[in-house]
Amino acid sequence: VSSLPSTGRTLAEWTAASRSDFAAAAESLRALRENLDTGSNAWISRIPAKRLEEEIRRLQKLPPSLPLYGVPFAVKDNFDAAGWPTTAGCPGFAYHPTISAPAVARLEAAGAILVGKTNLDQFATGLAGTRSPYGAVVNPFDRAYVAGGSSAGSAVAVAEGLVPLALGTDAAGSGRIPAGFNNVVGLKTTRGRCSKQGVVPACPSLDCIAVFALTADDAGVALDVIEGYDPEDPWSRSDPTTDSAPSIPKSLAIPQSTEWFGDNRAELAWLGTMARMEDMGMALHAVDFTPLFELASLLYHGPWVAERHAALGGFIEARPEAVDPVVRTIIARGREFSASDVFEARQRRQELLCEVRALFARHDALLVPTAPSHPLLSAIAGEPLEQDSRLG
């Protein structure tokens, strides 16, 4: 295993430094810019020196009491940021927005400074972080292993201690899996809670913004900044919250059985996690997760892939040579489903949700492994679709 990445500053440490000694904090930002490229392929674009100086001057005019005053952050390169190209991991798709996505704009208004846009599985289609013409994102703990995707670069940028905060997206694991593989917090926000305006869609009805941070508290601070109803986002909801679990859950549902695909380290980590939860006084209840597994199968193998085709099929059919072959194959499958297939799947989803709600009613929270295994880069190269389906 390679040397472990150093832990960076938390949000509180960055804001405290910026408030107490602005000149020194500005020098820290300049030094950060010089050291962003660690060879991990985490970045697609990084802030130029001239723009950083403009951002430092902007920061000087803002009140130091802002919650993210002086905090550097990154965003997955499917978010629009004014003055930055948006590629979604596909150079042929790239465009230059003049307006930032609301999530980006809210972070900047809270005093944060965007220092770069991060690498991803092209069009957020993948769970390994390898389907990118900008290079496969490598895991900073061991470069033989995948970083996880699709928000690979955002997770790695936080794991390497470069930024304390990064945004990604998550429809089916794209925020949580790279967080788990890189030892950082990954928060998938509630569907509709944060505006997705200015974010390249993958599966619009399921896409959610994801937050990467070093601590759960930091992820919560960021969520407080970016959440809110957006009347211009057709998927935004004015009150998307549900009843909250207790702050310290007592009853946790765990899967009755888990397939580890021969990854003994993943199994040992899971056993250790369960033991720690029990040591903390939590009761673990083995539950039949069949409804959840069927939901996952519907998402990955059912007609929801047609939604990806609806969002991106026009570009892919016009510019097939610009698209990663595996991504092209996955999204092209969306043409195979009929309208009847879609409505049948929607009905089945609602039936399964009734079973899932009953599960939640009996327990405070679910405790599950982030992924059943952590594949090598070589395994993904040999079996890209099979390995991806295991992660999902």
Language-model features and meaning:
Residues G70, A109, V163, V326, ...:
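Glycine-rich, small-residue loops and helix-cap segments
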Residues K188-L271:
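A short helix-breaking turn/cap at a secondary-structure junction
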Residues D21-E27, R57, R265-V287, G313-A318, ...:
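Acyltransferase
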Residues P85-H96, D263-N264, L376-P384:
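Glycine/threonine-rich flexible loop motifs
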Residues S2-A171, A275, M280-G281, A358:
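Gly/Ser-rich catalytic/binding loops embedded in alpha/beta enzyme cores
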Residues S2-P5, L68-P91, P249-A253, P303-L353, ...:
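Short helix-loop capping/hinge segments that flank enzyme active sites or metal/cofactor-binding pockets
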Residues K76, L107, A219, M277, ...:
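Conserved hydrophobic/aromatic pocket- or pore-lining residues that grip, position, or stack substrates
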Residues G129, Y134, T169-Q197:
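Glycine/threonine-rich beta-strand-loop-alpha-helix active-site module
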